């Protein structure tokens, strides 16, 4: 539940995070109606939170946040598995964090802490700790690891911090600022995303002054991302592709130096229900038809059924 301030008489809006793409513009307009939902400012007072999978988020209650920060955080946590959520919850309490921007920073390091909720299986504790510290290892190496010895070395060698989620061993991590409080950092790419772009103002190479957008997205979300980077129009913007589900034939047909972000978005919206074989077919059609821009490719995608294709 978000409000403009902590005044009990202030109007409130109930917002689901991450915000469903189809509801994004409606949500922002509703927040604007209660004088919150700004592009950069932390002007949303978190009056209440209901969350079953991540109770640590309740620490946000009573703080001010930006709506896109909360949306980003909700999306990031959506990608966490059960143990990663446990790590995040425990790390929030271990480091005493409560602000949305702090939690965004923590989301990049929470996977580096070891959390022990049950000390009865030292073998399992040791192997999980080893994976946490090393990120990954050869299955044979893990099988041959003495998990009990590794667990005992952890328990005797590090101070443990007791939280309601278990004992946290922080493995000496240092919390670093991944988020500069204005430009939202890159995030995992969900299956619904067709293309991920990095946006920055033309002629500006400052790595801190850039935004990542995932297409398709609502037009308002794209416009807000542009404003955070200081871009007033597509003509002032440089786009770099960081990931794409389109085949090479489509990507090579697009001139990202001249293409419109909004035309690219319309193309991705048109292809949002495509299966893998549809993308392959679109690539073959583009190879034959030689389109020169996103609008041309969108027209081909709209009429894909009119083409015969034998893969």
Locate the predicted segments by residue:
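Histidine-centered catalytic/metal-binding microenvironments
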Residues: 162
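Mixed-charge (acidic/basic) macromolecular-recognition segments
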Residues: 27-144, 148-152, 166-192, 208, ...
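Short, extreme N-terminal segment that most often corresponds to the first beta-strand
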Residues: 1-21, 188-219
């Amino acid at each position: 539940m978000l409000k403009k301030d902590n005044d009990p008489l202030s109007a409130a809006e109930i917002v689901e995070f991450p915000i469903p793409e189809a509801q994004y513009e409606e949500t922002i307009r509703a927040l604007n109606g209660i004088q919150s939902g700004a592009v950069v400012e932390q002007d949303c007072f978190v009056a209440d939170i209901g969350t079953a999978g991540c109770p640590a988020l309740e620490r946000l209650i009573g703080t001010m946040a930006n709506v896109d920060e909360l949306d980003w955080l909700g999306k990031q946590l959506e990608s966490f598995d059960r143990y990663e959520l446990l790590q995040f919850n425990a790390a929030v309490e271990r480091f005493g964090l409560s602000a949305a921007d702090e939690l965004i920073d923590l989301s990049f390091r929470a996977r580096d802490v070891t959390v022990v909720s049950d000390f009865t299986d030292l073998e399992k504790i040791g192997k999980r700790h080893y994976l946490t510290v090393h990120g990954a290892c050869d299955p044979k190496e893990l099988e041959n690891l003495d998990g009990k010895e590794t667990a005992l070395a952890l328990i005797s060698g590090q101070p443990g911090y007791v939280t309601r989620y278990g004992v946290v061993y922080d493995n000496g991590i240092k919390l670093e600022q991944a988020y500069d409080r204005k430009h939202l950092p890159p995030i995992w790419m969900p299956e619904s995303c067709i293309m991920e772009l990095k946006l920055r103002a033309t002629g500006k190479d400052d790595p801190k002054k850039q935004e990542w957008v995932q297409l398709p997205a609502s037009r308002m979300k794209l416009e807000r991302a542009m404003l955070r980077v200081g871009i007033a129009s597509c003509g002032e913007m440089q786009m770099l592709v960081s990931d794409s589900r389109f085949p090479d034939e489509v990507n090579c047909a697009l001139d990202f130096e001249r293409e419109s972000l909004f035309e690219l978005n319309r193309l991705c919206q048109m292809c949002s229900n495509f299966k893998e074989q549809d993308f392959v077919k679109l690539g073959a059609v583009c190879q034959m038809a030689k389109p020169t821009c996103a609008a041309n490719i969108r027209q081909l995608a709209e009429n894909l059924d009119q083409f015969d294709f034998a893969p």
